[in-house]
From Swiss-Prot:
It comes from Pseudarthrobacter chlorophenolicus (strain ATCC 700700 / DSM 12829 / CIP 107037 / JCM 12360 / KCTC 9906 / NCIMB 13794 / A6) (Arthrobacter chlorophenolicus). PROSITE patterns: ATP_GRASP (PS50975), CPSASE_1 (PS00866), CPSASE_2 (PS00867), MGS (PS51855). Residues 133-328, 677-868 form the ATP-grasp domain. The gene is carB. Residues 951-1096 form the MGS-like domain. ATP 1 binds at residues 129, 169, 175-176, 208, 210, 215, 241-243, 285, 299. Pathway: Amino-acid biosynthesis; L-arginine biosynthesis; carbamoyl phosphate from bicarbonate: step 1/1; Pyrimidine metabolism; UMP biosynthesis via de novo pathway; (S)-dihydroorotate from bicarbonate: step 1/3. This is Carbamoyl phosphate synthase large chain. Residues 403-546 are annotated as: Oligomerization domain. The large subunit is composed of 2 ATP-grasp domains that are involved in binding the 2 ATP molecules needed for carbamoyl phosphate synthesis. The N-terminal ATP-grasp domain (referred to as the carboxyphosphate synthetic component) catalyzes the ATP-dependent phosphorylation of hydrogencarbonate to carboxyphosphate and the subsequent nucleophilic attack by ammonia to form a carbamate intermediate. It comes from the Bacteria. Mg(2+) 1 binds at residues 285, 299. HAMAP family: CPSase_L_chain_B (MF_01210_B).
Length: 1109
């Protein structure tokens, strides 16, 4: 059936900020969907609060709303835009829950809007655990024995039937939030309590434990003519009990017998029909008992999910794109496969390779958190690799994680350690794979480890095989052709072979290349080479036949940013994608190298060619060699993907690879303290007093000279890893003792910490002659909080025009002194009217997408062209990529105000005792994503940013205030304002006295440390947990009060109420609350903002010309 003709406009709901469990994969699916809708001639309206996404680029939709994704706001957009339909299946759980709410509230009916891509009945059947159980039974399949409960008493009753351990899963949550394993009644009370709170319907499922069973999922699609395809089967390396997002996963499933696979297929097809998904994709998860072969259906997601992004990248079958076409009325047999251009989408993909996905964790950011893996997802990113066999794909995937110790270690294992390793491996943690492999290497048997871990014996055999190959390498003596070929076919890196043969990586590489042992590149074509592929999408293998086609002109390589992690996320992928788009438009062939399956950059049609490879020196050099042999390389961009490719810049240049844009020497100069301070001296600029130390004696001497507090950090890090503010000598000695690897090459940097300074962030472009200043951001939190976690506002709201002018001059002097060609990000601090330079990064920064969205200028595209020799003047005139006059520092007074707010993952991480980790901000970055609020005025923009970050401010109720002595004076005005607005103020001891003396009625409550009174009056933490407080404002002080504050903040985080920890943010919140009480919110699209901005810039230019004349 051809597509429907009655739909003229569609509203797509995005997934909002990147959080654990809902990450970049939804930008990838959303971008594909928007492209399809536009190609089909529809008017496209988008709402998404995350500015770091490609899908919110104005060219992808006709009206792009960067607004909070709440039913109230989406209703405003529907009222204004009047779409014919809403497509909610591409924005994860956020979009689905919003669509369900709009349907329940009667909004869809009121405006006569249809839901496409999924119907409410199918969502309810798939997501509501009680109803889904019925579906499975009607299909003649089994689900685990279970009870649905809504209260704690019901839970305790159900426990009598099910017995411990049991699995607890709330309904309608994402990434396993609020779920867990209860081994006893205490666990049950704790987990069910959280689950009832996180589930929007206060419904929780308790089910029998199927711990240790094998877990699989099938990715399916169905159209309205009842054609069903199974796109991909995925198997989890870890047994049931570890969330699939935290497990190593393998596609296709490798340990199923043919009969078992057919059974899973039959059940899946019956389930998708019974649920009624008929215009899109879904995934279904199964567990199989290894002892009896009993099959149980775990759950299904009636939408595009994390697994569908993985399945798309693993097979080349564009699930999101095809799901969108199905929602418009097409059927699978009418949709062509992009890669082969001959087969329709009703052909199931066939794989002649193995795909392995490995999660990337960030426990180093939360030292107090427990690294046991459970049914609540904790990983922040993932890497994927492909190989001709499992061992090769696994080793490549581990190498792609880029974490110290992420590659398998084959050094010998003493006998006494084996028993300890087996014992440790019983508990699933981030280290389990390594413990299992080391135990096998030390002589443990496959049986022993299967007993301990329930990991399928086939996988354990594969690890044993890797250990065998490592022994052969060690015993070979010399680097022979046979040995190297065997090692390479099992995925060993030159570095690993070097360690086993006592050679350097460079020597191994030299010998290997001299012997002619080089990888070839195979193609992902969805059909195991049955038809030719038109979209070159490659992976390396040590095989016979190379499939890279000849190209007529030299290519430009863009090195991506690898797996997402805290400090290096989707913002860097955004710059890589923009560079590829701009360079292709300018007529270049672009080649993307990356290993992150979630992102837009690894979509097969973003660049001319895609290599799905680890970003290590060895792998990148081989890709460059493959490009050289087939048509030449013009150069490589290393400054778009964050720290990952930057680290390779010097080694690539040493290997004779041309680096485009800023040179490796300039990159080094900005990182090198001494050289950089000479640039500042020459320009007459100052930085906070600082020094570098390689020992505690050095550090003590420097700290005494510059005075405490000091900021200490290792050199060459991103996201403030290992950074700390140190207030005295004992803490300094503790920091140095814990700092790993302080060497003369990697000293510790010590800076004077500027208290009460305003931090300023600048993104600019420089071409060697001219500068274009993209934007000046003023941080809302004071200095000392990592720039990635601080809220910031553009244009700046409290900086005078003379400060802006000084920032401009300083930015230009630094860009020129460093020798930047392209993007540079500089952080300044303004203290007592002195402008200090904190640091300069000659690369794309994490604020580039935000600045681009706020000012309507796509800076990463401009930077890519500057790297190929285009000047800023040409970008203003010929390319029309930059405004003809002025820049981001000369925005007119009526320009919209944009606020960027960080989104933090504290509710996911718990200490071993089950408490939430502390939500205090500091110099080490902890946020996973960001949102943007944009409006005519700062107060409303700030309110929108808080709502978008799931931290909506209250407009009435009780506010708890307790601040450190140093802050008491500065909060009186704000608290008085809240009191005047009718809020009830609640406070402890000292703060309450100060407030009362200033005429503010404050109700006193007990501190956490005081405990409950004899009369049973609870503490402030008890009030928060009981839901009696609407907002917490608590600034930390030292010692006991610190733990008091922690208990309080943990209570606020676990119940999900706003918890403010800095004075500056509190004052902004008071302004925002007042604005919310006074004005109605309006919604404005980026396209409307850009048009208005253009008008006022023209008017300003005309006025300036008149004055000249």
């Amino acid at each position: 059936m051809p597509k429907r003709t009655d739909l003229k406009s569609v509203l797509v709901i995005g997934s909002g900020p990147i959080v654990i469990g809902q990450a970049a994969e939804f930008d990838y699916s959303g971008t594909q969907a928007l492209r399809v809708l536009k190609e089909e001639g529809l008017r496209v309206i988008l709402v998404n609060s995350n500015p770091a996404t490609i899908m919110t680029d104005p060219e992808f939709a006709d009206a792009t709303y960067i607004e909070p994704i709440t039913p109230e706001v989406v209703e405003k957009i529907i009222a204004k835009e009047r779409p014919d339909a809403v497509l909610p299946t591409l924005g994860g759980q956020t979009a689905l829950n919003t669509a369900i709410a709009l349907d329940k509230n009667g909004v869809l009916e009121k405006y006569n809007v249809e839901l496409i891509g999924a119907n409410i009945a199918a969502i309810e059947l798939g997501e509501d655990r009680e109803k889904f159980k019925g579906v499975v039974e009607r299909c003649g399949a089994e689900s685990a024995r279970s009870h649905i409960i809504h209260t704690m008493d019901e839970a305790l009753e159900a426990a009598k039937d099910l017995g411990y351990p049991m699995v607890v899963r709330p309904s309608f949550t994402m990434g396993g939030l609020g779920s867990g394993l209860a081994y006893n009644e205490d666990d049950l009370r704790r987990i069910v309590g959280q689950g009832l709170q996180y589930s929007p319907t206060s419904e929780v499922l308790l089910e029998e434990s199927i711990l240790g069973w094998k877990e699989y999922e099938l990715e399916m699609m169905r159209d309205k003519n009842d054609n069903v395809v199974v796109v991909c089967s995925i198997e989890n390396f870890d047994p049931v009990g570890v969330h699939t997002g935290d497990s190593i996963t393998v596609a296709p499933a490798l340990t199923l017998t043919d009969r078992e696979y057919q059974k899973l297929r039959d059940v899946s097809i019956a389930v998708i029909r019974e649920v009624g998904v008929d215009t899109g994709g879904c995934n279904i998860q199964f567990a199989i008992d290894p002892a009896t072969g009993r099959v149980v259906v775990i759950e299904m997601n009636p939408r595009v999910s994390r697994s569908s992004a993985l399945a798309s990248k693993a097979t080349g079958f564009a699930i999101a794109k095809i799901a969108t076409k199905l929602s418009l009325g097409y059927t699978l047999d009418e949709i062509p496969n992009d890669i082969t251009q001959k087969t329709p989408a009703s052909f199931e993909p066939t794989l002649d390779y193995v795909v392995v996905k490995v999660p990337r964790f960030a426990f180093e950011k939360f030292p107090a958190a427990d690294n046991t893996l459970t049914t609540t997802m904790k990983s922040v990113g993932e890497a994927m690799a492909m190989g001709r066999n499992f061992t090769e794909a696994l080793q490549k995937a581990l190498r792609s994680l880029e974490q110290k110790g992420s590659q398998l270690d084959f050094s010998s294992v003493p006998e006494y350690e084996v028993a300890e390793l087996i014992e440790k491996a019983k508990r699933p943690t981030t280290d389990r794979l390594y413990q299992v492999q080391r135990a096998l290497l030390g002589g443990a048997t496959v049986e022993q480890l299967f007993e301990a871990t329930k990991i399928d014996p086939w996988f354990l055999d594969q690890l044993e095989l890797l250990n065998e190959v490592s022994r052969e390498i060690r015993q070979a003596g010399a680097l022979t052709t046979d040995m190297l070929q065997r090692a390479k076919r099992h995925g060993f890196s030159d570095e690993q072979i070097g360690a086993l043969t006592h050679n350097s990586e460079a020597v191994v590489r030299g010998v290997r290349q001299a012997l002619g042992i080089r990888p070839v590149y195979k193609t992902v074509d969805t059909c195991a080479a049955e038809f030719a592929a038109y979209t070159p999408y490659h992976y390396s293998a040590y095989d016979e036949e190379d499939e890279v086609a000849l190209h007529s002109k030299p290519s430009i390589l863009i090195l991506g940013s690898g797996p997402n992690r805290i400090g290096q996320g989707i913002e860097f992928d955004y710059s890589c994608v923009h560079a590829s788009m701009a360079l292709r438009k300018a007529g270049y062939e672009t080649v993307m190298v990356n290993c992150n399956p979630e992102t837009v950059s690894t979509d097969y049609d973003v660049s001319t060619r895609l290599y799905f490879e680890p970003l290590t020196l060895e792998d990148v050099l081989e890709v460059i060699a493959a490009e050289e042999r087939t048509g030449g390389v013009m150069g490589v961009f290393v400054q778009l993907g964050g720290q990952t490719p930057l680290k390779l810049a010097q080694q690539l240049a040493d290997a004779g690879v041309p680096i485009l844009g800023t040179s490796p020497e300039a990159i080094d100069l900005a990182e090198h303290r001494g050289a950089f301070s000479r640039v500042l001296d020459k320009a007459g600029l100052v930085s906070p007093k600082n020094g570098t130390a390689v020992s505690f004696e050095d550090a003590k001497k420097i700290a005494d000279e510059i005075g405490y507090p000091v900021l200490v950090r290792p050199s060459y890090v991103l996201g403030g890893r290992g950074m700390e503010i140190v207030y005295d000598e004992p803490n300094l000695s503790r920091y140095i003792a814990n700092a790993t690897e302080i060497t003369p090459d990697h000293p510790v940097l010590i800076d004077r910490f500027l208290e009460d300074a305003v931090e300023i962030d600048v993104d600019a472009l420089f071409d060697g002659t001219d500068m274009y200043l993209g934007g000046i951001m003023e941080h809302i939190e004071e200095a000392g909080i990592h720039s990635g976690d601080s809220a910031c506002v553009l244009p700046p709201i409290t900086l005078g025009s003379n400060v802006v002018e000084r920032v401009r001059t300083a930015t230009r002097a630094i860009a020129e002194g460093v020798g930047v060609r392209g993007l540079i990000n500089i952080q300044f601090a303004l203290a007592s009217d002195v402008l200090y330079v904190l640091e300069a990064n000659p690369r794309a920064s994490r604020t580039v997408p935000f600045v681009s969205k706020a000012t309507g200028v796509q800076m990463a595209k401009a930077a890519a062209l500057i790297g190929t020799g285009v000047t800023i003047n040409q970008l203003r005139t010929a390319y029309k990529m930059l405004p003809e006059t002025g820049d981001g520092s000369t925005l007119p007074l009526d320009a919209p105000v944009a606020v960027k707010e960080a989104v933090l993952p504290f509710s996911r991480f718990r200490t071993p005792e089950g408490k939430v980790v502390d939500s205090l901000l500091g110099p080490e970055m902890r946020s996973t994503g960001e949102v943007m609020g944009i409006d005519k005025h700062f107060d409303t923009a700030f309110a929108k940013s808080q709502a978008g970050a799931n931290n909506a401010l209250p407009t009435e109720g009780k506010v708890f205030v307790s601040v450190a002595n140093r802050d008491k004076r500065s909060v009186i005005m704000g608290v008085k304002r809240l009191s005047d607005l009718g809020f009830e103020i609640v406070s402890t001891g000292g703060t309450a006295d100060v407030l009362r003396r200033n005429g503010i009625a404050a109700t006193p409550v007990r501190k956490v440390a005081e405990g409950s009174s004899a009369e049973g009056e609870g503490t402030i933490a008890d009030l928060v947990v009981a839901g009696e407080i609407d907002m917490v404002f608590n600034t930390p002080s030292g010692g006991e009060a610190r733990s008091d504050g922690y208990e309080l903040r943990a209570a606020a985080t676990s119940i999900g109420i706003p918890c403010i920890t800095t004075v500056a943010e509190f004052n902004a919140a008071v302004q925002a609350i007042e604005a919310m009480r006074t004005y109605e919110w309006s919604v404005t699209s980026l396209q409307e903002h850009a048009a208005a901005l253009g008008e006022s810039q023209k008017a300003a230019a005309a006025k300036a010309d008149l004055q000249h004349a």
